[in-house]
């Protein structure tokens, strides 16, 4: 296409060529923003968000302390300091309002899409192909889990730095001056990726694959291998740290739990599953049932995989992108494919975030003969992007809250215990004990040896008054996993409700030896106070405050112990602080009123009892004490 000016003819083709990638990216960004708009109203979910972020006291440290802890501490079977720092900053800025945390995830995903475009364009020089791949990556429903799940910040951050590492490496390869600075930048970005999540641990191998195509520099074998040595050393160090941490926290399945044959079968099935879900992204869920894989099915999958690899190898001269695409997809899945089993999930949507790029690369470059500027082709691409946006927007709604997420998971795969267990937790916290018991029971039907469900049932039965059953579940939880701190805590609570205080204190102490939590400190302090060990009880409550300075229950218990020790002013101060932190804390208001009544300050005591009853109309002690004060006041008036 050309247009004539007064003196010369000016081609408009370059403008058109630049306009198409920009239009594709703009469409994808707008579509992604629309599809994820609802997350601003979403909550934290019970899968990891509570433990990782919302209730993680370590993230509330000052920034220097947060950095120090992130670099040296392990939490939730992970070492990923940059992710912890990111979550800590979010908590400082947004508090426990999930909207801000979700919005940051969406922005990171959008940024990853833009970086992916820049990386692929730098690697291949193909702007339109790169834009199509980046657009499909942005709007694909398989990535909803990585974006709408706050705890998957680690996947987004790791991918951001991983893509930057590849981009810098591509610049290094093609640069004519100051090349080594770009290689150093690539190495630093890789280190940051591993410090966010060891998702990109296979990057050194991926760089060699990219050296084959599109960089076409495999002839310089010695140089290629030498420049990868620092990357390989970082990958080895990260792998060792990950294996140590995962094994120490019991997150890795033993060979006895999952046999090598089963691991290989699951890996072959998972490769097919990820490829299929990229093409047909339906029935996506937060957890999936492990599929039964027969020997015959395993043989078919292995043969299909072998044929595909053979075909890509045979086509390496004419269509080198096929081998690169296959190796990108299959190689980057290795850490999460189940050969080294972490957890019990056979596959997960979030694991496709990086490998899917390889599939998209193969498909889009396989369509390279298309005229991407043709109206029909552009309309088809727009239609595909639109359909994916609609499907993504629908999948995003699944993450609105715990019930939506968990019931959806059960609608996809009924025979998995974790959604039932977490629904039990949700209904217990919302006061629906009957439904909680139902889902805990269903969880044990699916997995009778689920220690976490036995732990939850121990405390629930004890609270409902069936202490014998609660103790039985607590003992079973500990038999199944003796180093589970919450199991010891739940058993201690069951013993406490049964009046077996000495055994309760022992269980709480064992829990604290495994993991020091403020709630368990308060539980043991409460038992010690009931046994008149006031000084040790006070020490437990004060230690709970060191762990969580905003723990209202700790202040309330300190006030109670101080009152029993005769220090009424200190008791009042503690109750005041408890009610300032939690204005609807009925027990603290009632205890404060009792101290004031003892001092003869009846009018203020009555006000405290009134506030206690406003917060909890069923608070019997506050009602009785207020009635007593009103009778005293009536008698005085007469």
Where are these regions (language model features)?
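Terminal, low-structured helical/coil segments at or just beyond the last alpha-helical repeat
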Residues: 598, 606-610, 614-638
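Structural marker of alpha-solenoid helical repeat scaffolds
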Residues: 412, 446, 480, 513-514, ...
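Conserved alpha-helical positions within TPR/SEL1-like repeat arrays
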Residues: 418-428, 452-462, 486-497, 519-530, ...
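Polytopic membrane enzymes that build or remodel cell-surface glycoconjugates and lipids
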Residues: 2-466, 472, 479, 486, ...
